[in-house]
């Protein structure tokens, strides 16, 4: 499971279903605040990278256990504590096409979901938000 796992408008990643979240970080463009990459670490697994580009959703895993924050051009925000995600269980991660762009949904067994999506009407293009189901 090393490398790019998905590059499509739709995918369903079942490998992490039922596992608890250890960490969720985002790489942010400091110029516009847009989310570039979501880093998800689930129990017993390496870090998974999720991102959107040109209307397509991507999922990668490079068998890394730490987020490389050496790039000073970007900001790395840890949302684990801010959104109280540590220990919450993943029930599904999937990408779907919405308005000719992909979005990635992270469903949690605790009745919450995280959504990585594209919004062309804002100053920044890519957002992540936490919602109740």
Residue ranges and their predicted role:
Residues 1-133:
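Surface-exposed, interaction-prone regions used to assemble/regulate multi-protein complexes
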């Amino acid at each position: 499971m090393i490398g790019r796992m998905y590059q499509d408008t739709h995918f369903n990643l079942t490998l992490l279903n039922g596992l608890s979240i250890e960490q969720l970080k985002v790489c942010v463009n400091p110029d516009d605040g847009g989310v570039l990459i979501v880093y998800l670490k689930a129990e017993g697994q390496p870090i998974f990278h999720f991102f959107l580009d040109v209307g397509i959703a991507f999922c990668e895993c490079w068998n890394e256990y730490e987020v490389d924050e050496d790039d000073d051009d970007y900001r790395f925000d840890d949302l684990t504590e801010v959104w109280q995600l540590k220990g919450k269980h993943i029930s599904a991660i999937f990408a779907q096409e919405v308005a000719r762009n992909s979005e990635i949904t992270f469903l949690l067994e605790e009745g919450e979901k995280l959504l990585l999506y594209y919004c062309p009407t804002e100053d920044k293009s890519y957002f992540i938000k936490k919602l109740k189901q």
